[in-house]
Structure formats: C-alpha cells, structure tokens
From Swiss-Prot:
Protein name: Ribonuclease SLFN12
Protein species of origin: Homo sapiens
Keywords: Cytoplasm, Hydrolase, Nucleus, Phosphoprotein
Similarity-based family: Belongs to the Schlafen family. Subgroup II subfamily.
GO MF entries: ribosome binding; RNA nuclease activity
PTM annotation, UniProt: Phosphorylation at Ser-368 and Ser-573 negatively regulates the ribonuclease activity. Dephosphorylation is induced by the interaction with PDE3A and stimulates the rRNA ribonuclease activity.
Gene: SLFN12
InterPro entries assigned to the protein according to its UniProt record, in alphabetical order: Poxin-SLFN/SLFN_N (IPR031450), Schlafen (IPR029684), Schlafen_AlbA_2_dom (IPR007421), Schlafen_AlbA_2_dom_sf (IPR038461), SLFN_GTPase-like (IPR048729)
GO CC terms: cytosol; nucleus
Chief location bin: nucleus
Role this protein plays: Ribonuclease which is part of an E2/17beta-estradiol-induced pro-apoptotic signaling pathway. E2 stabilizes the PDE3A/SLFN12 complex in the cytosol, promoting the dephosphorylation of SLFN12 and activating its pro-apoptotic ribosomal RNA/rRNA ribonuclease activity. This apoptotic pathway might be relevant in tissues with high concentration of E2 and be for instance involved in placenta remodeling. May play a role in cell differentiation.
Known outcome of mutating S368A: Increased ribonuclease activity
Subcellular location per the Swiss-Prot or TrEMBL entry: Nucleus; Cytoplasm, Cytosol
EC nos: 3.1.-.-
Amino acid sequence: MNISVDLETNYAELVLDVGRVTLGENSRKKMKDCKLRKKQNESVSRAMCALLNSGGGVIKAEIENEDYSYTKDGIGLDLENSFSNILLFVPEYLDFMQNGNYFLIFVKSWSLNTSGLRITTLSSNLYKRDITSAKVMNATAALEFLKDMKKTRGRLYLRPELLAKRPCVDIQEENNMKALAGVFFDRTELDRKEKLTFTESTHVEIKNFSTEKLLQRIKEILPQYVSAFANTDGGYLFIGLNEDKEIIGFKAEMSDLDDLEREIEKSIRKMPVHHFCMEKKKINYSCKFLGVYDKGSLCGYVCALRVERFCCAVFAKEPDSWHVKDNRVMQLTRKEWIQFMVEAEPKFSSSYEEVISQINTSLPAPHSWPLLEWQRQRHHCPGLSGRITYTPENLCRKLFLQHEGLKQLICEEMDSVRKGSLIFSRSWSVDLGLQENHKVLCDALLISQDSPPVLYTFHMVQDEEFKGYSTQTALTLKQKLAKIGGYTKKVCVMTKIFYLSPEGMTSCQYDLRSQVIYPESYYFTRRKYLLKALFKALKRLKSLRDQFSFAENLYQIIGIDCFQKNDKKMFKSCRRLT
C-alpha cells in the first residue's frame, strides 16, 4: 500500500496521496493487470477509511489514463461499489472533483449519528456461522457481538446440557447433524465413495481440494472457518468430501500429513483473539487424519478438524480499519479497534438547560438588566458593524487600542459579511492544544451563515512560517469541530494572514480562498450549529475556562440566536441573580 500524507498541500486538510490511479468505467474494465486494479481500489478504500476516522480530508490521486474526463467517463464501478460498501449514503460523505491531472475525493468526517458506530471499518474480520455459510460480521453485527461478550465477560466453552430429557419423538434438529458429525469424527477408517449421513449445517462444513493445491487452499480458508465456528457454537471442518457428500479423500504421504498438521497449528495459533474473561484461554481444537480405504487398501485421507466454541472473540486476522497518526496512515490495532467499538464515548454537557444551570452557579456578579439588553451591550464594539458579534469584548478593545490599523482592517474585512461571529484569541493554536507561536499578535475566527469559517492570523514580523502555523491551526479546528464538537455537516476552514506594520499599515500576505477550490456543498455551512460545535469542543478542551471566564462569556461564544428556544429560561436564570 502506497499512501502518503501530502505535507505540501495548500488545503487546510489532511490530504492523502494514493499515487497513480486509472479512472473511468471503460478504462478500469480494460485494465489487463487485475492485481493492479485491486491494489488501486484497496489504496483508495483504505485512504477513505483513514480520513473518515481522522476528521475528514481529501484523497488525491494522479490520473493514470490520458484524456480522462470526470464528466464524460465517471469513476469506475468497482470503486463505486467499494464506496457503497463503506458508506450507507455516499453523497453524505463524499464529493468528487477533477483538477487538471489530479482527481480529488473530499471526505467528510465519520458521524456517530449516522450508524451508531464510532469508527468506520472495512472489515471486522470476525466471522460467524449463518446456517451453512461462514460470513464476516459487518460493523453493526460485530458491535453487538462484542458488546454482548463484554457484558457477560465471555461465555462458557460448552453449551449447558439440558437437565431434563425431552420426549423422544420424530424430530430432526441441527444438533442431530452436529452429533452425527461427531460420530464421524471419532471414526478411524472410512470407505471410499461412502455416503455421509449428515449434511452441511451451522456446525458442519465440507470441502474437497485437489492434492496439488491442498496446503495452499487449507491455509487460505482455515482462519475464516475457525473464526466462524469459534464465535458461534463450535463445529467440524471436513476436507476430502465431495458435493455429493461422498468420501473421496486426498493422497498424501505421512510426512505430508505431519507438515499439514504443523501448518494448521501454526495458522490457528497466530489468529488474533480478544478476551473479556479472566481465564484467557487459547483456541481449543482437535485435528486428525482419517484413512480412506478402497476394497481394503489405503487410498487417501480425510482431514477432520473440530473447533470448540470460544469464550470470547476470535478474528481471522486483524480488523481492517485505518486512521492517520503522526502523519502516517496506520491500521488500528485490535485493542484500539475494540476500544473504539465498545467503549462508551465520554459524555459532555451539550444541552443548554445544563449550560444555564452552570451559569446560575458560575456568574461572579449579578446582572440587573434584561438578558437581551445585556447581550447587545456586550456583543458590539463601538464603531463596528452591528451585524457582527465581536468577542471577547475586553480582548477586542485592548487589541484595537494597542495596534493601530487593526480596527479599520477588521471593519473592511467584515463589510461583506451579512451576519456572523468574530471570536478573537491571543492564540487559537494554544486554545486547540497546539504549540504557541510567539510571533503571532492574535487570531480571530469568523463564523458566518452560508460561508466557510475563516481563521484570521495577524502578526507584526515578516516571516513565511505563518502559513504553516495558520494551516495547522485551521486543520485542527476542523477536526475538533467534527470529532469533539459533533458537527455533522461538511465543513472547511479557510485561512487569511495579515501583516501589521509598526506604523499601522496592513497587508494581506496569504488568502487560502484564492488558492484552493472546494465542492459547492462545503460553502453552505450552518452558523448556529457550528457555534454549538465550537462551544462543545472548547468546553471539552477547557479553552473557555483557561482563556477567559467561562460563564461571563458563554453567551458571546454561542450567540443569542442559538438560545431562542430557551430565552425565557435564561431570562429567569439571570433575573434570579439580581
């Protein structure tokens, strides 16, 4: 897999470069190298999974085939099917764009609200028996299976036996097949072409492989069948029986059987398991080779494998789920994956009734004027547009007094904004848990209706490093809005960098909006929900408490329009403090 993080991108996004990819339905159908087509599909799918689990971003693919046109040729059915296998509703998460010789896939962050799952998974690699089939559990089934195991702290290796005998009537059940398979397993000799007295079921699987590819085929199928039987109720795998349920057997020397038994043991012992119980036992199985005789002469063998049901969870291989960590695309470890699947998400106060309750006990001084008047007086600095909320007011005033030209610059920048909130900070980077840049004068985050958030960075030192600072801050902010704040819509954060000279002159040194293009859906943001998500993210990061008084500035951060349903409650809360 050749996926790398593009560190030179202009986007304030996680951009994953998947290399050269052939695109278009006809072109992908005509690819002679099927392995290459599969590898390209795998790389795109893993990159998508990694971005979904890492706050969203962009997949960048260099277009392999000449004269490709997205509008004429499309993407390719195999890729589209992979997208559908990952996502229930593809348009909710993905947007596609061709930019010259590059194809870009914009990926929105995974949303817990969509499926109830905290992460995206390409394959759980947890198998189960569904009557006569071994099937991999989808993420939802895996979640239920793991939750049940965690709740019960595992299970007994064997099903409890019935205490009372049932009436002996002419009833046939699956357990009859399992019992007959057990009798067959205990035999020492078999007759060629002998018919079985049982068939495939939840507890029985029958296979017939040619001698030439016997070892290879057993190694290929063994993990999924062992996982399926162990995760269900145990069962038997018989190799050397045909579709007509006749005993055929395979030819082998004794040394071949020894090698085969060692490979089976090696394969089973390296299968990943996860325990919720205290015993932490190994997979319990028995392997034997039953001699097949034709008119009294040994002519082959049947491989018989009995797998006991397991106490906890058995994987065929590690879960196929990815994320971006330390600028690398990495597969989640089994432990990480299970924690994301079954551990409860920490709950943080997000209801405004709870927020109001905090205000009642947190406000340091009484307010005798009505809430709306208090809101108006605290929101707007004199001389600035009433369409924009500026906060925190004290920092805003101080910056305007200390730095000539900043107020005029802000007025000019906000002139075209219909309605918005401009939130100042000495360092948004520090607020988000990143490293401080002492050369930065301040940052300001603009959140307005139907327009992407804009992060303004102001500095008084000529230095090119501010682009990296601003880009990283914007990227982190976007990720926090989605993963911590719970913002479920598509969003991007634009950046703009200004230089303020000691004489009060200002100049724009960088404007991301002139450098990159996003799909249309990224420009229609919801200000109200962005502010809510921002509040939740900062509250969890404790930036609100660290930067300025939590209660005193709560309304300024969220905005009065977000509280319209609770105006009466808030008014009463404030009045009780007088």
